[in-house]
Amino acid sequence: MIFMKEIVAIIRPEKLEEVKNALEAAGCHGMTVTEVRGRGRQLGITESYRGRDYRIDLLPKTKIEIVVNDEDVDTVVETIVKSAQTGDIGDGKIFISGVDEVVRIRTGESGKKAV
C-alpha cells in the first residue's frame, strides 16, 4: 500500500521565494527545485528585439518536487496554489503521484520515517 505521494509543481520562476516561504510556514521544509523550460496553453510568447520579433516557444519555469505522507498532500497542494497563483495563463500545474518507497541514504531508514 502506498502511503506517500510525490508532488511536482511547475510554477513561474518569480513565484519561487513566495512558494518556498509559504511551504516552510506550513511545515514543509524538504524540496528539490530545478530550473526548467516548458509550455502549456500559454504556447510561448513573442518578443521584439531591435525591431525584429522573436518567438520563444519554451518559457522558463521552476519545478518543485516534494515527497510527503498522504495526510499532508492537501495542505501542500493548497499552499502551492495560494502562493503561486496570479490568475493568468502560465501559472503552472501540479502533478501528484504515488511513491512506493523512500530510503534515507544517511541512516538507511525507509518508509514514513525517511520522509
From Swiss-Prot:
Keywords: Nitrogen fixation, Nucleotide-binding, Phosphoprotein, Transcription, Transcription regulation
Residue numbers bearing the O-UMP-tyrosine modification: Y54
Cited Gene3D superfamilies: 3.30.70.120
One GO-annotated biological process of the protein: nitrogen fixation
Top-rank lineage group of the source organism: Archaea
PROSITE patterns: PII_GLNB_CTER, PII_GLNB_DOM
Assigned GO CC terms: cytosol
Pfam family, one: P-II
GO molecular function (one): ATP binding
Family (UniProt): Belongs to the P(II) protein family.
Biological role stated in the UniProt entry: Could be involved in the regulation of nitrogen fixation.
Protein name, per record: Nitrogen regulatory protein P-II 2
Species of the source: Methanothermobacter thermautotrophicus (strain ATCC 29096 / DSM 1053 / JCM 10044 / NBRC 100330 / Delta H) (Methanobacterium thermoautotrophicum)
